[in-house]
Regions:
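Conserved GTP-binding G-domain of TRAFAC-class P-loop NTPases and closely related GTPase folds
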Residues: 70-75, 79, 85-103, 108-114, ...
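Conserved glycine(s) of the Walker
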Residues: 4-5
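Switch II (G3) loop of P-loop NTPases
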Residues: 119-140, 158-162
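Switch I (effector-binding) loop of TRAFAC-class P-loop GTPase G-domains
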Residues: 20-39, 94-122, 136, 279
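P-loop NTPase motor core
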Residues: 8-96
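P-loop (Walker A) phosphate-binding loop of NTP-binding proteins
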Residues: 1
Length: 280
């Protein structure tokens, strides 16, 4: 599904099971880090306008300096202090190289199909990252008839969010519809379905302030109970499976946690090997 962390999982696989990122890839991510900073600032400003949150200082509504004008001397000390901050110095240094965590947290929309190959023991894995947005799905749904397993990612934290491409559609409802169509598709009749309910760290914080029942009235538990809310969404996906021969293997994940992903992917490998032995 869109905005679920698929690309982050693929990055983790490169870090855990491959040789990591080559210099050309790291340089590309360096540019993306800077782009994400600008995008984030723009989103904050747009959100303030949408929510009608005024700036504390009305003078910030219009720039006090026009192009070509020098900065007033009163800005010197604050800018000097900001520039001296170790984090800022690291990021904007000409020798700045993104760390693994920087790369994992970079955001760039996936378009088309991106393949990652890595070796795990005697096995060679080919993983395909596909765009999750509606416009991307028609490009890949028919391409994977013979895959060993489908790793389906959904952002469990998106239960109260709308789609990027459709502000009137709920992310979780959309993910449920997509999972239903893939799980029961003619292309994946004999394919193992591994479900990653991702961004569990964000979900844990969200339920404290955003009631699940507000968006899913059929939830009858405690809105702030982590175990009850996660179980509710896990069961929603599992119940969509219409085949008695097919198992759904759910996992709660945080795609930026390398140690957690290493452990979970060990379990996924066991599932895939078991499936292969069954098919012999």
């Amino acid at each position: 599904a869109g905005e679920s962390g698929k690309s982050t999982i693929l990055k983790q696989m490169k870090l855990i099971h491959a040789a990591g990122f080559n210099p050309a890839e790291i340089e590309t991510f360096r540019s993306i880090v800077f782009l994400n900073i600008m995008q984030s600032m723009k989103l904050v400003i747009e959100a303030m306008e949408y929510l009608k949150i005024p700036l504390d200082n009305s003078d910030n509504m219009t720039p006090s300096i026009t192009k070509g004008q020098p900065f007033p001397i009163i800005y010197f000390e604050p800018l000097k202090s900001l520039w001296a901050d170790p984090g800022v110095r690291q990021l904007f240094s000409s020798s700045y190289i993104p760390t693994d965590q920087d790369i994992l947290r970079c955001r760039m929309k996936t378009s088309g199909i991106v393949e990652t190959v890595f070796h795990l023991g005697p096995l060679t894995y080919r993983m395909f990252d596909v765009g999750g947005q509606r416009t991307e799905r028609k490009k890949w749904i028919h391409c994977f008839e013979d895959v060993t397993a489908v790793l389906f990612l959904v952002a469990i934290s998106g239960y109260d969010q709308c789609l990027v491409e459709d502000k009137d559609s709920n992310q979780m409802q959309e993910a449920l519809m997509l999972f239903n169509s893939i799980c029961n598709s003619q292309w994946f009749v004999n394919t193992s379905m591994i479900l990653f309910l991702n961004k569990i760290d964000i979900f844990r914080e969200k339920i404290k302030v955003s009631p699940v029942k507000k968006y899913f009235p059929d939830f009858l538990g405690d809105n702030q109970n982590f175990k009850q809310t996660t179980h509710f969404f896990k069961k929603k996906f599992q119940r969509l499976n219409r085949s008695q021969k097919k198992e759904i293997y759910p996992h709660f994940t945080d795609a930026t946690d390398t140690n957690l992903l290493r452990h979970i992917m060990g379990s996924v490998t066991d599932i895939i090997l078991t499936q292969n032995l069954r098919d012999l």
